[in-house]
């Protein structure tokens, strides 16, 4: 994994600031992203891991947009971002799992918290960019009963798509939907970040529909 190449690619895109454009498309943020930890149990719990360098527990693009969409479609959704141990640093992309062990363990602890604190909740999840690696790392290590409570997972710009053969290991493939834009090279085993990697806000409505369709 070429971290220097990743850094240069991100630097080349900074002037265009595509993440900021995504924020302008979906400026409303209805959640601080800590509703599982600090709120009441809801019928649905949404756990999300943001992209590298994004601020806030849900990030500033696909995370809050998908949270908002789910809240609009359903009565009772708790949105929870992975953090603060998951720091979404650029350097973590170059680690063997595409993210840090601390991030993976924190995500696992949130899935466990959802099941223990809110035994009747249905869990859905998502990740964007490095956040997809968090989900690829976290979900296979959960016990089977907890995996059964996870009804659907959506992954945007999946940095582990090629490595894991378009699926999350040891998790039903029909519960997963992976969004890889044409020309997004991170989906093909590289750390080359180009403009298509910042296009996933357009897939949020379809992703929300997919997650809603998986609920019982």
From Swiss-Prot:
One Pfam family in the UniProt entry: Cutinase
Swiss-Prot/TrEMBL GO biological process terms: carbohydrate catabolic process
UniProt-listed Enzyme Commission number(s): 3.1.1.74
Main enzyme class: hydrolase
Cystine bridges: 41-118, 67-79, 180-187
Molecular function as annotated in GO: cutinase activity
UniProt main location, coarse: secreted
Signal sequence annotation: 1-16
Keywords, alphabetical: Disulfide bond, Hydrolase, Secreted, Serine esterase, Signal
Annotated function: Catalyzes the hydrolysis of complex carboxylic polyesters found in the cell wall of plants. Degrades cutin, a macromolecule that forms the structure of the plant cuticle.
The protein's name: Probable cutinase 2
């Amino acid at each position: 994994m070429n971290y220097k190449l990743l850094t240069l690619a991100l630097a080349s895109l900074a002037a265009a600031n595509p993440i900021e454009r995504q924020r302008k498309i979906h400026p409303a943020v209805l959640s601080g992203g800590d509703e599982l930890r600090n709120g009441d149990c809801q019928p649905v719990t949404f756990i999300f891991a943001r992209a590298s360098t994004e601020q806030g527990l849900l990030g500033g693009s696909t995370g809050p947009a998908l949270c908002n969409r789910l809240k609009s479609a359903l009565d009772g959704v708790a949105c929870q971002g992975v953090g603060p141990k998951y720091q979404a640093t650029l350097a973590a992309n170059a680690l063997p799992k595409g993210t840090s062990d601390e991030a993976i363990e924190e995500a696992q602890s949130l899935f466990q918290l959802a099941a223990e604190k809110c035994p009747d909740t249905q869990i859905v999840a998502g990740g964007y960019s490095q956040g997809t690696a968090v989900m690829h790392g976290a979900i296979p290590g959960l016990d089977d009963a907890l995996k059964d409570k996870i009804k659907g997972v959506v992954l945007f710009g999946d940095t582990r798509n090629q490595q894991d053969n378009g699926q999350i290991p040891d998790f039903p493939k029909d519960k997963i939907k992976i969004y890889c834009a044409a020309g997004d090279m991170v989906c093909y085993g590289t750390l080359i970040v180009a403009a298509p990697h910042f296009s996933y806000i357009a897939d949020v409505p379809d992703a929300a529909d997919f997650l809603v369709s998986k609920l019982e």
